[in-house]
Each structure stands twice: as C-alpha cells, then as structure tokens.
Amino acid sequence: MNKIPMTVAGQIALDEELKRLKTIERPAVIAAISEAREHGDLSENAEYHAAKERQGWIEGRVQELEDKLARAQVIDITKMSGDTVKFGATVTVLDEDTEQESTYQIVGEDESDVKSGKISISSPIARSMINKEVGDVAEVNAPGGLKSYEIMSVSWG
C-alpha cells in the first residue's frame, strides 16, 4: 500500500471535505432521490437520474478520500529545517534563461495549486529540485525544451 505524502494542512482539507460529503451532501442527495421518486415514472424522471448520478459521484469521492486518508503520510513541515529541498519546502528559484525568480512550495497531489505557488511532489519541476541545495541547479525537461533553475533559498513552515 503506497503512502501518500501530504502536509498537515492537506490532511485537514481532505478531512473537512470528507465530513462535508458525509454530513451535508450525502443526506441532501438521498432527500433529492426520495423526492424525485414521488414524481412517478422513474424511466423518464430527469431529477431522479441526476440525483442518482450525483449520489454515485459522492460515494466514489467518499471512498477515494477515505483511501487517501488511510494511506496518508502526514508531514509536519514546521518541524523541518535545512537547506536541502524536500517535501514541504518552500523553494525560491531563479530561471537561468529569463532571470525571473519564482517561489514554490512542494506539497501533495491534492494540495497543489500553481496559482498560489503550491506544486505537486510528482510534478517535473518538484522532482528535479528534490535533494538539491541552495546554489544547485535543477534541470527540467519542459515542453519548450530544457529549463534550468538555480535554487536561491529553501525555507520551512
């Protein structure tokens, strides 16, 4: 069973989504199915079919979240330190072609949000930075060709 790395914040977000699905979404869709059944012929009842489809999605997502949480390897980044890039690190890099600095935090799959600077541990740029230190150059095979990023700083928390 493969562990899924995530930050404490990532675990909390998945827990909250699971709780919302179980306590709010699931009962609401059951009520919608019940109400749609009262409208008679189910074969041509669009409300019923939409509610059943929504129920299937909710149940699938509940199972997915329960599985991810069961396999979670929660990493408390506030207890980490050092200049080596690892999961949870916030890394400032310098694009050697454009001289533009960017800052990324390396997080779990479900936490990634490029717009807010959070990149997945499995993304090419994150994989290229892992185990590098300040001053090292990470090379990434990007769609436009090879990109080189110098690690400027590594911080935690």
From Swiss-Prot:
GO BP: DNA-templated transcription elongation; regulation of DNA-templated transcription elongation
Keyword Kinase listed: no
SUPFAM superfamilies: FKBP-like (SSF54534), GreA transcript cleavage protein, N-terminal domain (SSF46557)
Any one Gene Ontology molecular-function term assigned to this protein's record: RNA polymerase binding
Keywords carried by this UniProt record: DNA-binding, Transcription, Transcription regulation
DNA-binding is among the record's keywords: yes
Function according to Swiss-Prot or TrEMBL: Necessary for efficient RNA polymerase transcription elongation past template-encoded arresting sites. The arresting sites in DNA have the property of trapping a certain fraction of elongating RNA polymerases that pass through, resulting in locked ternary complexes. Cleavage of the nascent transcript by cleavage factors such as GreA or GreB allows the resumption of elongation from the new 3'terminus. GreA releases sequences of 2 to 3 nucleotides.
Family of this protein: Belongs to the GreA/GreB family.
Identification of the protein by name: Transcription elongation factor GreA
Species whose genome carries this gene: Maricaulis maris (strain MCS10)
